[in-house]
Curated annotation (Swiss-Prot):
Keyword field contains tRNA-binding: no
Motif ('HIGH' region): 41-51
Enzyme class: ligase
A GO CC term assigned to this protein in UniProt: cytosol
EC numbers, comma separated: 6.1.1.4
Classification lineage: Bacteria, Pseudomonadati, Pseudomonadota, Alphaproteobacteria, Rhodobacterales
Species for this entry: Cereibacter sphaeroides (strain KD131 / KCTC 12085) (Rhodobacter sphaeroides)
InterPro entries, per database record: aa-tRNA-synth_I_CS, aa-tRNA-synth_Ia, Leu-tRNA-ligase, Leu_tRNA-synth_edit, M/V/L/I-tRNA-synth_anticd-bd, Methionyl/Leucyl_tRNA_Synth, Rossmann-like_a/b/a_fold, tRNAsynth_Ia_anticodon-bd
Annotated residues for binding of ATP: 622
Catalytic reaction equation(s): tRNA(Leu) + L-leucine + ATP = L-leucyl-tRNA(Leu) + AMP + diphosphate
Subcellular location: Cytoplasm
Name of this chain's protein: Leucine--tRNA ligase
Molecular-function GO terms, alphabetical: aminoacyl-tRNA deacylase activity; ATP binding; leucine-tRNA ligase activity
């Protein structure tokens, strides 16, 4: 008997699929469509096991849907712009384009052996001029639609990458790629008006029923809707033109506990004082050395500068509050000014304590007396409290009721108005780097800011650039930078900023519907293929990428590039777990960890016998060397083993631990399936009474595997296939029944292990390719179970089981039980004292 050889067979079946055009997406109005998409990768140069798991999940869905009669779109591309390519050019020489396209070629060569059902004819990279040229066309359309504008803004500046970062790209006060501390700088920036859609983006989350609740909650919190009061303090001692200080507060019920007012370092009043006071200028400069994100400001030490100015309380003009410039106030949220109530905000409490300001409680827990506070009392807004310095509503009420009453009262007294605000700010997209999509704008002394003429698109990046010094090479490239105005023909300058790379990934799903179209999308193709039916990717993209994509779909709908139905581009979202691995380390003479690759460790030791410390499984990391190269697994076991293992060991939303023993077990099972198929293909037994039982088992396998795949419970589908393999190997059914069951097995396992499935299908005489075979359907009549399995207990101990027809009389069941070998051994020739048959449940034998 020959042996299963994945290395020899997998490439052969991949060639057969390609030759038959099996995975080419076809616009077929006669068939329902299904669009499955995994978040496309950054071309770093190597795929990892996380990629394998992610793309295998999508592949399982795509293959099953195709078999079920859908016209499937399952594309792949590359999120190819970004700083790593520029960093590589600076560190190693060469050009970002060469580095990027070289990595794409390497990763494509690593992905193809996995046997993914991808329509490679639709492949593109976001750094292709054909792609970013269409992005530039959309930018111009968005300018005309009023969705793009330019203004001076305080931004997060990464001094190492020498570029602007969005707030979301600042992690712990540092740049998300460089790790450098971020500073604040004022620059002229391009913005998308995403904040115009804040309410709509928030409300529409409720329609995304097939998204994880966690992701919807994260987006809702990021959009951050709040209801509050906007009002003005009158000022005392302020410069001319600053007789009022506009404030926004979400807790107007605490107005009677106010002890100070504070403004952002970027507030117009602070800017005015900065120009006339050296001490203010020094303090503001210090504030700007902290990033602009809320996270950065929250973690920084709270500092303030007493301006000497005062504001008058709106309900008592004799009550004056000092005005501070504070480093924790954001200019682009609310009005850039607040009042502080230290008793009910921990940040304000720390600030007031530091600067010796009064702390006046407004409300207390029910049933308590006023005492000096050791910390701020900040109950949930839904909690009922006792207002001791309230001015609206009941004496005892919830915070929510207190806020609503305070807004109503203040409006009735002419003190401000109720306002709904959002944390979500407009999306600053300007980046001072080369390897990104050029912003298609010309600066003309006569005409001002002018969009490039569409017939001149794409505005291509120049190839002859140098990375000898930090900064944006486009600023130093006069033949590219200097141009003529498309409106008047005079000398002009190109915009040298490029777009945030999140723009590139915010519409790629739409481009896949017609990747060679001469416009961003083709209306007919977009109408057929959109929306993405199943989107798959990591939870780390819950806010940035997914929120930006939702905004872009709306912008594309407004500018005529997507149909109205695609306003929410992703019908269903699945966030998969990570692939983890143990960490192996020894320590050097100084006690520092030295990490080792898994292949260098055997039985907890290195090749020289040195024992290693084993750290429990963690996310695979190149720095900690707990990585497994998928190509090594494919060479050793075959692609199907890698696919089977990452799908079988854990629910897909959870992490899966990669182990060598697990991979070996998966490989052994697949070899067992091949041997079983080989044996059945040569069987010649006659039809018999067991055929019906095998047909019923096959029907159950079809039903449960289908349910598992369609419900994203891939591990349960695989568990059923294990069980079906055991059933088939033990069955005494006739040859034709077993061949029929084995062909069904090939169809059911095809989404997970497509190469082995083709081998089995061909071995058992299946017609054509199993990849093109229709998904099997279970006969409903065979799913009705007319038998029951009864456990047999002898003196309370389980001794076996018996399967009988459900309607069998108890007397007939007793005869079969007494004939059972295990029962006979227990009886030892004696008659039982009692034999009790509980219909449909159990048989008890008492001796």
């Amino acid at each position: 008997m020959s042996r299963y050889d994945p290395a020899a067979t997998e490439s052969r079946w991949q060639a057969a699929w390609d030759a038959a055009g099996v995975f080419t997406a076809r616009h077929d109005p006669a068939r329902p469509k299904y669009y499955v998409l995994e978040m496309f990768p950054y071309p770093s140069g190597r795929i990892h096991m996380g990629h394998v798991r992610n793309y295998t999940m999508g592949d399982v869905v795509a293959r099953q849907k195709a078999a079920a009669g859908f016209s499937v779109l399952h594309p792949m591309g590359w999120d190819a712009f970004g700083m790593p390519a520029e960093n590589a050019a600076m560190e190693r020489g060469g050009h970002p384009k060469d580095w990027t396209y070289g990595n794409i070629a390497d990763m494509r060569a690593q992905m193809k052996p996995l046997g993914l059902s991808i329509d490679w004819s639709r492949e593109f990279a976001t750094c292709d001029p054909e792609y970013y040229g269409q992005q530039q066309a959309m930018f111009i359309d968005m300018m005309e639609a009023g969705l793009v504008y330019r203004k001076n803004a305080v931004v997060n500046w990464d001094p190492v990458d020498m570029t602007v970062l969005a707030n979301e790209q600042v992690i712990d006060g540092k740049g998300w790629r460089s790790g450098a501390p971020v500073v604040r700088r004022e620059l002229t920036q391009w913005f998308f008006r995403i904040s115009d859609y804040a309410g709509e983006l928030l409300e529409a989350l409720d329609t995304l029923k097939d998204w994880p609740e966690k992701v919807r909650l994260m987006q809702a919190n990021w959009i951050g809707q709040s209801r509050g009061l906007q009002f003005a303090f009158s000022t005392a001692g302020a410069p001319e033109g600053f007789d009022r200080l506009e404030v926004y507060t979400t807790r107007p019920d605490t107005l009677m506990g106010a002890s100070f007012a504070a403004i952002s370092p970027d507030h117009p009043l602070a800017r005015h004082l900065e120009r006339h006071d050296a001490e203010v200028a020094e303090f503001v400069a210090e504030c700007r050395r902290v990033g602009t994100s809320e996270e950065a400001l929250e973690k920084a030490e709270k500092k303030g500068f007493d301006t000497g100015l005062r504001v008058r309380h709106p309900f008592d003009t004799a009550w004056e509050l000092p005005v501070y410039i504070a480093n924790f106030i954001l200019m682009d949220y609310g009005t850039g000014a607040i009042f502080g109530c230290p008793a009910h905000d921990q940040r304000d409490f720390e600030f007031a304590t530091k600067y010796g300001l009064p702390i006046r409680p407004v409300f207390l827990p029910e049933g308590t007396e006023e005492t000096a506070l050791a910390e701020a009392f900040v109950p949930m807004k839904s909690e009922r409290v006792h207002y001791i310095r309230g001015f609206a509503g009941a004496e005892v009420q919830s915070g929510e009721e207190g806020v609503a009453a305070a807004i109503d009262f203040c409006e009735s007294q002419g003190v401000g108005r109720g306002v709904t605000n959002y944390r979500l700010r407009d999306w600053g997209i300007s980046r001072q780097r080369y390897w990104g999509c050029p912003i298609p704008v010309i600066h003309c002394e006569t005409c001002g800011v002018v969009p490039e003429a569409k017939e001149n698109l794409p505005v291509r990046l120049p190839d002859d650039v140098s990375f000898d010094v930090p900064g944006n090479p486009l600023d130093r490239h006069p033949t590219w930078r200097d141009c003529t105005c498309p409106k008047c023909g005079a000398k002009a300058r190109r915009e040298t900023d490029t777009m945030d790379t999140f723009v590139d990934s915010s519409w790629y799903y739409a481009r896949f519907t017609a990747p060679r179209a001469a416009t961003p999308t083709d209306a007919e193709e977009a109408d057929y293929w959109m929306n993405v039916d199943q989107y798959i990717g990591g939870i780390e993209h819950a806010i940035l990428h997914l929120l930006y994509s939702r905004f872009f779909a709306r912008a594309m709908q407004k500018t005529g590039h997507l149909p109205a139905k695609a306003i929410e581009p992703f019908n269903a979202l699945f966030t998969q777990g990570m692939v983890t691995h143990e960490i192996y380390l020894t320590r050097d003479a100084a006690g520092r960890p030295v990490y080792h690759l898994p292949e260098d460790v055997t039985d907890g030791k290195l090749a020289d016998g040195t024992p290693v410390e084993i750290i429990p499984s963690a996310k695979m990391s190149k720095s900690k060397k707990n990585v497994v190269d998928p190509m090594n697994i494919i060479r050793q076991f075959g692609a199907d083993t890698a696919r089977w293992f990452v799908m079988s060991d854990s629910p897909p939303e959870r992490d899966v631990e990669w182990t060598a023993s697990g991979a070996e077990a998966a490989s052994k099972h697949l070899h067992r399936v091949w041997r079983l198929a080989d044996e059945i293909s040569r069987a010649d037994g006659e039809a018999n009474a067991e055929d019906g039982a095998l047909d019923k088992a096959t029907a159950r396998a079809i039903a449960e595997v289908t349910q598992g795949v369609e419900g994203f419970a891939f591990n349960k589908a695989i568990a059923k296939l294990y069980e079906f393999t055991n059933t088939l190997s033990r069955s005494g059914a006739g040859a034709e029944a077993k061949k029929r069951a084995m062909r069904t097995m090939a169809q059911l396992m095809s989404p997970m292990v497509p190469h082995l499935a083709e081998e089995v299908w061909a071995m058992l005489g299946g017609e054509g390719l199993v990849a093109q075979a229709a998904w099997p359907k279970a006969d409903p009549a065979l799913l009705i179970d007319d038998t029951v399995t009864l456990p047999i207990q002898v003196n309370g101990k389980r001794r076996g089981e018996i399967t009988v027809p459900k309607e069998m009389a108890a007397s007939e069941v007793e005869k079969l039980v007494l004939a059972d070998e295990a029962v006979q051994r227990a009886l030892g020739g004696a008659a039982p004292k009692k034999l009790i048959v509980v219909p449909g449940r159990i048989v008890n034998v008492v001796i």
